[in-house]
């Protein structure tokens, strides 16, 4: 059921129970405080009182006066009505009965060279109202000096707005403010001077030389493309200016088939040379799907060629790896002996 006063949600039973328990605890603590003040202190507290009555009693004992509207001040030092009206919105003024004494004007942690540029926040006398105009003039002149290049220093009496302080504004020491250091470009200018005609960064040139050295000396399980090797060799031979050819080796050619199953159905070329071709021309052929045949640009050494080539008919080539039974396709009968019979009871013996 919604409350008549507002349109908020209805608190649950657990929330209502927590609120009741919290309120009972608060009232029990307040009752003990009131009982102690009545028993052990000179406090005139009514039987049913709230926190305001306790605060009034404590202020009276401390020598303060609390009026019915809540105005509180020391006894015998009642401030004027105009000052009481401005207590909430303005800073308190110096009073002989006030416990808050503002710091005297003109004091600052840094010596100020210009006294006319100080700004007093929170109001003051009539003579201080005209100090804003010189400060704005100083600020505008300082901005022109910074933007136009005639002066790169802030004035020594540059004022800052304090965060709620009513004392004199804090001024920085009479020195130039910290300046962002200029980026050092000597190394880049030197490199640009020596490599004026190159359009590639240093890592490209180094990468080209390393790619050529790796492709010519280090063994690789995936053989590089001849186009990439030629580009790397040209990049290493031409230096930094011709290193663009090395990057050209990374371009993907669109002339080849885009189907991922092309390499599975296309018959791979025979990279093992004429000897393996002659040995594989018998009735037993090699399976292209199971044999370790790579792409068309594979270049194998003679030792690896002799070590990993399959044996031919009758084992003519010694030292070769013998193909296991599943690697070879046995053709026991010729193609003319094969016949497709569909639902016929005739057999080869009946013919």
Swiss-Prot record:
Residues covered by region (Required for DNA-binding): 9-93
Annotated region described as Disordered, given as residue ranges: 1-24, 69-126
Amino acid composition bias (Polar residues), ranges on this chain: 90-101
Annotated protein name in UniProt: Protein BZR1 homolog 4
Function noted in UniProt: May function in brassinosteroid signaling.
Record bears the keyword Lipid metabolism: no
InterPro entries per the UniProt record, alphabetical: BES1_N, BZR
Biased composition (Low complexity): 102-120
């Amino acid at each position: 059921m919604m409350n008549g006063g507002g349109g908020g949600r209805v608190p649950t039973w657990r929330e209502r129970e927590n609120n009741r328990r919290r309120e009972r605890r608060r009232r029990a603590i307040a009752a003990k405080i009131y009982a102690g003040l009545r028993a052990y202190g000179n406090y005139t507290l009514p039987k049913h009182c709230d926190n305001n009555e306790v605060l009034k009693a404590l202020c009276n004992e401390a020598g303060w006066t609390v009026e019915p509207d809540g105005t509180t001040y020391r006894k015998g030092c009642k401030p004027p009505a105009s000052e009481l009206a401005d207590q909430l919105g303005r800073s308190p003024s110096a009073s002989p009965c006030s416990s808050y004494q503002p710091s005297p004007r003109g004091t600052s942690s840094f010596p100020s060279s210009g006294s006319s540029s100080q700004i007093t926040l929170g109001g003051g006398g009539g003579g201080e109202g005209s100090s804003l105009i010189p400060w704005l003039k100083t600020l505008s002149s300082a901005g022109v000096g910074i933007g136009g290049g005639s002066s790169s220093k802030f004035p020594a009496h540059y004022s800052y707005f304090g965060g709620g302080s009513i004392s004199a504004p804090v001024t920085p020491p009479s020195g130039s403010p910290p300046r962002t250091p200029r980026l050092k470009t000597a190394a880049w200018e030197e490199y640009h001077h020596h490599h004026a005609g190159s359009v590639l960064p240093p890592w490209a040139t180094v990468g080209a030389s390393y790619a050529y050295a790796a492709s010519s000396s280090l063994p690789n399980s995936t053989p590089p493309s001849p186009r990439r090797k030629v580009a790397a060799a040209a990049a290493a031979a031409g230096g930094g200016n011709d290193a663009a050819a090395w990057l050209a080796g990374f371009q993907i050619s669109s002339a080849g088939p885009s189907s991922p199953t092309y390499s599975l159905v296309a018959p791979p070329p025979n990279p093992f040379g004429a000897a393996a071709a002659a040995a594989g021309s018998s009735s037993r052929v090699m399976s292209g799907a199971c044999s370790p045949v790579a792409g068309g640009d594979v270049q194998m050494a003679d030792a690896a060629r002799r070590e990993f080539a399959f044996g031919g008919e009758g084992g003519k080539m010694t030292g070769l790896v013998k193909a296991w039974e599943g690697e070879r396709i046995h053709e026991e009968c010729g193609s003319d002996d094969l016949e497709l019979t569909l639902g016929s009871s005739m057999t080869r013996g009946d013919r």
